Design a protein with these regions (language model features):
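Short beta-strand His + acidic residue motifs that chelate non-heme Fe in jelly-roll/DSBH
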Residues: 63, 81-82, 99, 105-112
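Ligand-binding loop in jelly-roll beta-barrel domains
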Residues: 103-129
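A short beta-loop-beta micro-motif enriched in histidine and acidic residues
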Residues: 46, 58-73
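Glycine- and acidic-residue-biased ligand/ion/polar-headgroup-sensing regions
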Residues: 68-85, 95
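Structural recognition of the beta-strand scaffold that forms the well-ordered cores
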Residues: 63, 71-73, 96-99, 121-123
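Short acidic-glycine-tyrosine-enriched beta hairpin
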Residues: 40-44, 55-56, 85-102
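A short, N-terminal "cap"/entry segment at the start of jelly-roll beta-barrel domains
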Residues: 2-9, 13-49, 82, 98, ...
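N-terminal leader/targeting pre-sequences
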Residues: 87-88, 102-108, 131-137
Length: 137
């Protein structure tokens, strides 16, 4: 039987909580699954995180920003995104975008009301920082 160590469990919880905003009216949040975390030897003090974000039909993420660099790749469906003051753009499966640290991500949603969408996300963030931070209301 595998033992889960408390620091690992707390770190994982600390990463997931900022990625899962509160939702009202019975809506379900996007589903975030951390695939791997590594501390690259050539980037002391940094942590590389790979995860997936799955959206059901019509689902969206709350407005947020990332303290580290982010690269997002659409694995399935289509995702509409708005970064900083740019116009909204819809990315289809096979397309990708980059977010510089601190970029305001005000729109991130499944572009379809009938089909799911899924992103593969890679982020390089300072050790001890979450991948995603909610925007202050």
């Amino acid at each position: 039987m595998r033992t889960i160590h408390l620091p690992v469990a707390l770190l994982t919880l600390g990463l997931l909580v900022p990625l899962s905003p509160a939702w009202a009216h019975g809506e379900k949040p996007d589903q975030v699954k951390i695939l791997q975390e590594q501390s690259p030897s050539n980037a002391p003090g940094k942590k590389a995180v790979m995860l997936t974000v799955s959206y059901g039909p019509g689902q969206a993420s709350a407005a947020h920003q990332h303290p580290g660099a982010v690269m997002a790749y659409v694995l399935e469906g289509a995702v509409t995104s708005k970064l900083n003051d740019e116009t909204e753009k819809t990315y289809k499966a096979g397309e990708f975008w980059y977010e510089a640290p601190g970029t305001v991500h005000s729109v991130s949603r499944n572009a379809s009301k009938t089909a799911p969408a899924k992103l593969l996300v890679w982020s390089l963030v300072d050790e001890g920082r979450p991948v995603t931070e909610p925007l202050s209301q």
